[in-house]
């Protein structure tokens, strides 16, 4: 196995402070492509990836996540992009599928010099009426 790849895995860390500048679109596209190419059970590719760059939606999703957390702080630590991975709960491998998508994207972001942090609570957000309404808007 190439040392560069192993080094990438070993040096990836969670980042909890971000610059406010936008992520270049080519870099964001590469990260999203890495998620799309992740392995999934039966090759079904059922997870949905949503990249939130619009400040209005970014604030709204942060507010919903903070409510689930019971906090009034930004659960996404000021990141200019929030990427959500929604996995089909009817698939027997939905947790594994979503996890593979997330890991691929986190490694791709690290390779491109971008920071990431895995933030939970999407299930709770989108089970709520506010979350369901937000999904309908998208």
Identify the role of each PLM range.
Residues 1-138:
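Acidic, surface-exposed loops and disordered segments
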């Amino acid at each position: 196995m190439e040392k560069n790849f192993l080094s990438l895995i070993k040096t990836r860390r969670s980042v909890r402070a971000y610059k406010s500048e936008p992520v270049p679109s080519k870099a964001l596209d590469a990260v999203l492509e890495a998620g799309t190419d992740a392995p999934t059970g039966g090759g079904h590719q059922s997870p949905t990836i949503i990249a939130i760059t619009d400040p209005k939606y970014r604030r709204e999703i942060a507010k919903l996540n903070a409510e689930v957390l019971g906090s009034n702080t930004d659960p996404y630590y000021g990141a200019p992009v929030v990427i959500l991975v929604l996995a089909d709960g009817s698939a027997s491998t939905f947790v594994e599928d979503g996890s593979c998508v997330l890991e691929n994207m986190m490694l791709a972001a690290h390779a491109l010099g971008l920071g990431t942090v895995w933030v939970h609570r999407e299930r709770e957000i989108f089970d709520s009426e506010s979350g369901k309404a937000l999904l309908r808007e998208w």
